[in-house]
Swiss-Prot record:
Name by which UniProt lists this protein: UPF0358 protein Aflv_1873
Phylogenetic placement of the source organism: Bacteria, Bacillati, Bacillota, Bacilli, Bacillales
SUPFAM superfamilies in the cross-refs: EF2458-like (SSF140404)
Protein family per UniProt: Belongs to the UPF0358 family.
The species this protein was found in: Anoxybacillus flavithermus (strain DSM 21510 / WK1)
Entry-linked InterPro entries: UPF0358, UPF0358_sf
């Protein structure tokens, strides 16, 4: 495999992971807009499942050498911060 092809595979893998992460961000944003998590545990389950699936995708890409471990961790850290903000917002709403 030529270096150019290897770089293209890495870029493509990272791009796909970012796209999947963006889908999860959109789910989180919908939740933030409606703050429905306390009333809808199913939606929380969907988010957890999506996060788990993405973490497995990232792990696979890291093991293949297509994505650096630190880059994969950065994607998950960003989503964890988004989820944390969602939980905080829902908790504040629940207390009101």
């Amino acid at each position: 495999m030529t270096p150019e092809v290897a770089i293209n595979f890495r870029e493509r893998a990272y791009s796909l992971l970012q796209a999947d992460a963006e889908k999860i961000v959109k789910l989180i944003q919908v939740q933030m807009d409606h703050l429905t998590m306390p009333q809808c545990p199913l939606y929380e389950e969907v988010l957890d499942t999506q996060m788990f699936g993405l973490s497995r995708e990232i792990d696979f890409a890291v093991r293949l050498g297509l994505v650096d471990e630190k880059d994969g961790k950065a994607i998950l850290d960003r989503l964890e911060r988004e989820l944390s903000a969602l939980h905080e917002a829902c908790t504040k709403k629940k207390k009101k």
